[in-house]
Structure formats: C-alpha cells, structure tokens
C-alpha cells in the first residue's frame, strides 16, 4: 500500500538549492496511536512556488498532473518567475515547454492543503518516504 500524506501536518520544509531538492517533513498524529513520520521529496526541481504558510499546515495531497494542464494553470506565474530571474530557461517559450519537459522527464506537481501551505513544483520525481521517529 502506498504511503499517504493526506491529513499530515507539515512540520518543516527544506529547499536545497545546489541539489535541486525540496523535502517536506510531515507527521500524521492520531490520539492514542504512534505518530507516523513521512517525508515528501521532490528531486530535480526546476521551479517551485509555495504560499499561504499558516504555521500549522495540514496537507491534502501532492499530485502529479499532466504537463499541459499544469502549464495552463500556472503558466502565467511561471512566465513571471522567468521575467524576474531568468529561470527556468524553458519558461522563455511556454508554447514549446511541454515537449521540452516531457523529453527531460520533468513533471508538474500540485501541493494542496486542507489548511495553509499550498503551491506547486516542477521536478523530475516525487517520493513519499517513511521516516523513523526523530531523536
């Protein structure tokens, strides 16, 4: 059975620029049960945007969406990121971007929350990993 992050609390997140990874550290807390620790790791990150951090965020899902759908929904925002900082370079031409992203194995992911932090990432992979309890 695949790990779920639905209703997990976001404890922290880390953006590692040089490695191009983002790690979301989450916990699933239920009274009278052991806390489940799960990390969501985006690898090969090309671009991302998170917003609405409530410092008590509850994740709903992190979903992979088709590139065309992703660019239809977030293309204007990605174009603005490119205008401001020149990255990601493929955003200079959003018409040819879907083909480039597919060729490079890059996908769009949408992070949705029941409360707080939401946003998106453009990355090669997402992994949902169990973690031993922190010491």
Language model regions located:
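Surface-exposed, interaction-prone regions used to assemble/regulate multi-protein complexes
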Residues: 1-135
């Amino acid at each position: 059975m695949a790990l779920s992050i639905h209703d997990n609390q976001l404890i922290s997140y880390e953006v590692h620029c040089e490695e191009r990874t983002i790690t979301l550290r989450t916990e699933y807390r239920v009274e009278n049960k052991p806390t489940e620790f799960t990390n969501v790791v985006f690898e090969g990150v090309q671009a991302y945007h998170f917003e609405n951090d409530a410092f008590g965020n509850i994740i709903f899902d992190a979903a992979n969406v088709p590139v065309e759908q992703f660019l239809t929904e977030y293309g204007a925002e990605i174009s603005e990121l490119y205008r401001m900082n020149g990255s990601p370079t493929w955003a200079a031409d959003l018409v040819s971007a879907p083909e480039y992203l597919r060729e490079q194995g890059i996908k769009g992911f949408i992070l949705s929350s029941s409360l707080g932090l939401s946003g998106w990432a453009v990355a090669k992979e997402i992994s949902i990993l169990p973690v031993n309890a922190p010491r």
